[in-house]
Amino acid sequence: IIYHSAQRSDIVTTFLSLCVLNACNADGIVKTIKCTLREHDLKLDNIVGIGTDNASVMVGVNHGVYKQLKADVPHLILIRCVCHSLQLATSAAVAEGLPRSLDYLVGDTYKSFARSFSRQQAYKELFGILNDGEEEPLKIVQACSTRWLSIATAVERVLHQWTELKAHFQVARLAEKCYSAEVLYSMYCDEINKAYLLFLRPVLTEVQRVNKSFEAHNADQTKLLDDLVHLLSSLIKKVVIPTASVDVYTTKVEDYLDPKPYLGYSFEKHVDDMKKTGLAADEEENLRKRCTKFILVLIEQIRQRLPDNIEILRKVSQLAVEKVLYVLKPSLVPLLEAMGIPTPSTRIDAIESQWRSITTVAWKDTSTTQKFWCEVYNYRDSYGENPFGELADFAISMLVLPYSNAEVERSFSQMNLLKTKLRNRLSPNTVNAIMVIRAGLKRNKKGCFDYELPEKTIRLIGTRDVYKVGVSKPSSSTGAPHQPEGLLGQVGDSSPDCDDDDLFTL
């Protein structure tokens, strides 16, 4: 859940609850969401947005979770997780645009070292000899779909150690009589494979940069979608003729293709070197076509996964602190009308008036957009009222939108660390209680080593009351674990400090 905490004067992203579904479909998910909100005294009407992946059960146009929730909350905003979208788009572009041998090259290079300590040691010794012992070899990582854009790091590591890996597999094919090493050595000898990776590296770096900004804890939410559109624009400019004027969302890029696009310094330099050693013209043409196709597929895949209302959401960048404090700035009315949040004309007039006069106050904390709007929210005049109250409420509602599902993935990782193969009998109640405690400690900026237990909790230790819980099993109606009322329920300020009237997102 993401909400504005007046107590902490901050935008808080935290774990709410672990729920057990009775039905693994859209109806079951919606029912569980509604019941969980009721259990935490949160109003369904206060949901501003919902962040999901691209699964049909979540975003299906006919009977998806979003469609059902929007029927109850007409102003609900859907934001598909950009991190998931970029991963899927990149995977599709690699599969359709590039030779399958590249996937084998990167994947089997990892596999050859993954479970063999002797190979790792042999490679480490060879690497030290070739580099005079000045540096250690970087670990070869696995490119897999479960880690967002892990292929970017995998490609970078392989390229950085190309010569050393080539020498290693040359030795391994003779010493071990290994067919896999023989195949990999022949692939490392093919300079066209290296050219593909040199082309991929800067493109994946750009995509990874945007992905990291969406994953970050302290990113400015008002600028994230601008970064995504700039990525799309940058990819288009790589393959179209310089004089072309294209719309990043709708233009058919194939109609404006550059016959010989510039595909990066390292790639072009390597191609020039290959020409000197006999690269045929048809081979170069095929190489460039495959690289161009990769970019075209990537552009199309990103377009398909862009939020339907991206142009509206991009207008949220008007709320960035540096733009707010401009004396001359565009009206906020188009954004107010586009968001679809119930706003009577009188309220729009009030917000627009406050938007124009906000520069009349000397604001102290303008380091980040979040801190600035929290200061505006808490501002009081001589009469004890906030003259910018409506504007601050609207800005806060935009800042709590779920632009990324990175925190959800982190919660999954925590749960996997808790409920392992050795601890596979942990009940949902216990796992939920531990995760709630961790989230509460994090919200309070405490740790297990410096948190002071309440006196009431200390008195319970060693008594039977410490084991008392409100409900020992999940609710039959929702499957959502109830918060324990014993010792676990009193540690870590387990309930989010989200007031009844606060807007929030899931």
Give the ranges of each region predicted by the language model:
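Alpha-helical structural modules in large enzymes and assemblies
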Residues: 1-506
